[in-house]
């Protein structure tokens, strides 16, 4: 282009390229904070608020019209009215059409604004003025994260279905399906987000420190000691770190080596543990030679340089989804022993192996005791959980060369074109949707039922805690993780060994089955069924029939547990509606007291059990005959 006496060279660019160019031109303004992404993020979160708060009876939208199986709702608030269309599914789940949502005030449609909706619902939420600002900050952070994903994650579901493990990890867009404020990450700044958020897929190095043994708890599986583990994990750096200590005049055998999250070192340890550093009880060693990628759980890392090496999980003192994400040194002292006990139980019962159910053991753990906080504070506190880490088995040694991995959370993933990864995975497998679901239930539900009925043992079976092993898209094995903090034995009839006493949980008998009905049915299957219904040939009714069939088949295989099947009836008419968002709204600093897990629970009446329709099937038999069409 000629401009008077000057000549300018112009290069056209596409809309997709604009965020990158904008970021380069304005490095202090996140490129994803653009109107179209922000509006889309708000529409997404408003949809989720309407869905989940209706499910938890916080709001009660009214049907004003019905047509072709679709309900048209209105929600009248003080200064505005929301309108939307949705299909009503089992477990009081509204599958809302995002494009149908609109809000009207004084006869004028207004932009959808998740923050505004939360404020309009403030009285119904019952949140204190002390906690509300932090919750609003978490909502904003969740919107920020969603806008980033909209701008940077456009991998089609069909591509993800064939992708490698870490591409899928970074490609997830939702987080926990129930919680509204599920990407709070209070403590991260803009640069931290790009460096440490799972969706950024950044490659990073861990900080390594030496911690004096008499201030630290180290525990490991039998036959594994600190030096053997760290030589395996650090390689030549182990010797380099020992030499560094010697050069400082320190005896290397007086210290353990500990990995630390880079953010945690910079923001917490270097300052809060300044006295320990000054006294030489904590010594900075340097960064890892190996490179890592953060996982969906945000404080766990997979080793990219050597994927066969351990996962590393570190304390991270950010507020995220109802907890400060620390790790307790007290818990670290017995975590490997708990893992060994659970693994021995699982491996001694052939049923688990037959179903393809495997434990990823936490093989070692370490925690530094800050004596001032431990002396000053008698109650549980995030200040006593700032400097701990653990090593967990990598999933890679558990798979064959042709097999792939993805967390079970991926089964709920929907891409920007509303295409479900689950549907793409079924297509890739070559199986019918019904056969795929049956195999999945055998891997996932059957072992969890067996743990519950045979051993009173429960896991935390949400999507991020389970890793599916796939062979050309076919589920063949399932890997359960996060054992030390999440496993419990409920009202167990047998005494537990002293080192695993922490697993014992006493609760009201009628609440025990909630670990299946809430954690699996309400928090996983409630979302899975509509995806199958909309994007595969398995209808919602057929899905729940397959679940019922799985339960009956399990019962038929274990008639000696008949008394327990009767006592904990999975086919009962209804179960208590446990409200996870209400729990977070009650205390978004610490949702659950691990010393008393039931204390902070919130309920809203009963919810109809989808399996109740199959109660009339003959005892402990398969429901297959009932479901077969008449000839």
Curated annotation (Swiss-Prot):
Pathways per UniProt: Siderophore biosynthesis
Residues annotated as transmembrane: none
Single GO BP term: siderophore biosynthetic process
Alphabetical UniProt keywords: ATP-binding, Ligase, Magnesium, Nucleotide-binding
Database matches in InterPro entries: Aerobactin_biosyn_IucA/IucC_N (IPR007310), IucA/IucC-like_C (IPR022770), LucA/IucC-like (IPR037455)
EC class name: ligase
UniProt keyword annotation of Transferase present: no
Activity regulation note: Requires Mg(2+) for activity.
Swiss-Prot/TrEMBL catalytic activity: 2 N-(3-carboxypropanoyl)-N-hydroxyputrescine + 2 ATP = putrebactin + 2 AMP + 2 diphosphate + 2 H(+); 2 N-(3-carboxypropanoyl)-N-hydroxyputrescine + ATP = pre-putrebactin + AMP + diphosphate + H(+); pre-putrebactin + ATP = putrebactin + AMP + diphosphate + H(+)
Protein name: Putrebactin synthase
Classification of source organism: Bacteria, Pseudomonadati, Pseudomonadota, Gammaproteobacteria, Alteromonadales
């Amino acid at each position: 282009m000629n401009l008077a006496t000057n000549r300018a060279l112009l290069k056209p660019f596409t809309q997709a390229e604009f965020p990158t160019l904008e970021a380069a031109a304005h490095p202090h303004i996140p490129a994803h904070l653009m109107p179209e992404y922000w509006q889309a993020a708000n529409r997404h979160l408003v949809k989720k608020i309407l869905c989940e708060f209706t499910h938890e009876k916080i709001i009660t939208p009214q049907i004003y019209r019905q047509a072709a199986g679709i309900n048209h709702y209105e929600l009248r608030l003080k200064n505005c009215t929301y309108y939307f269309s949705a299909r009503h599914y089992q477990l009081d789940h509204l599958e809302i059409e995002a494009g149908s949502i609109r809000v009207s005030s004084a006869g004028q449609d207004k932009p959808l604004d998740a923050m505004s909706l939360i404020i309009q619902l403030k009285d119904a939420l019952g949140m204190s003025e002390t906690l509300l600002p932090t919750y609003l900050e978490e909502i904003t952070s969740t919107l920020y994260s969603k806008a980033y994903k909209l701008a940077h994650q456009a991998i089609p579901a069909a591509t993800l279905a064939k992708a490698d493990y870490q591409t899928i990890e970074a490609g997830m867009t939702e987080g926990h399906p129930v919680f509204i404020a599920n990407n709070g990450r209070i403590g991260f700044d803009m640069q931290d987000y790009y460096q440490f958020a799972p969706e950024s897929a950044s490659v990073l190095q861990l900080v390594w420190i030496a911690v004096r043994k008499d201030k630290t708890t180290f525990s490991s599986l039998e036959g594994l000691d600190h030096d053997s583990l760290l030589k395996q994990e650090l390689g030549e750096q182990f010797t380099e770190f020992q030499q560094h200590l010697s050069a400082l005049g320190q005896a290397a055998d007086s210290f353990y080596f500990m990995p630390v999250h880079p953010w945690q070192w910079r923001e917490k340890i270097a300052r809060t543990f300044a006295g320990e550093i000054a006294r030489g009880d904590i010594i900075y060693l340097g960064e890892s030679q190996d490179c890592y990628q953060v996982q969906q759980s945000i404080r766990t890392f997979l080793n990219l340089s050597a994927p066969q090496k351990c996962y590393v999980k570190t304390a991270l003192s950010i507020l995220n989804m109802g907890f400060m994400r620390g790790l307790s040194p007290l818990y670290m002292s017995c975590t490997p022993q708990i893992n060994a006990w659970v693994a021995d139980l699982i491996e001694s019962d052939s049923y688990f192996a037959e179903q393809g159910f495997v434990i990823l053991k936490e093989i070692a753990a370490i925690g530094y005791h800050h004596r001032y906080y431990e002396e000053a504070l008698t109650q549980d506190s995030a200040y006593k959980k700032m400097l701990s880490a653990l090593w967990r088995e990598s999933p890679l040694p558990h798979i064959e060369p042709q097999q792939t991995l993805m967390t079970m959370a991926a089964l709920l993933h929907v891409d920007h074109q509303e295409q479900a990864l689950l549907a793409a995975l079924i297509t890739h497998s070559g199986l019918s949707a019904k056969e795929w679901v049956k195999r999945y239930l055998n891997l996932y539900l059957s072992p969890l039922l067996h743990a519950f009925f045979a051993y009173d043992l429960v896991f935390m079976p949400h999507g991020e805690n389970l890793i599916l092993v796939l062979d050309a898209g076919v589920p063949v094995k399932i890997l359960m993780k996060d054992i030390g903090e999440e496993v419990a034995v409920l009202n167990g009839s047998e005494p537990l060994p002293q080192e695993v006493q922490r697993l014992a949980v006493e609760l009201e008998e009628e609440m025990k089955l909630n670990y299946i009905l809430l954690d699996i049915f309400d928090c996983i299957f409630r979302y899975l069924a509509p995806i199958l219904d909309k994007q595969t040939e398995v209808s919602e009714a057929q899905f729940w029939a397959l679940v019922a069939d799985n339960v009956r088949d399990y019962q038929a295989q274990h008639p000696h547990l008949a008394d327990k099947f009767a006592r904990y009836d999975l086919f009962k008419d209804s179960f208590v509606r446990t409200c996870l968002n209400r729990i977070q709204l009650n205390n978004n600093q610490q949702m659950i007291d691990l010393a008393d897990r039931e204390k902070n629970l919130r309920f809203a009446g009963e919810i109809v059990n989808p399996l109740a329709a199959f109660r009339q099937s003959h005892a402990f038999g398969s429901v297959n005959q009932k479901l077969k069409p008449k000839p």
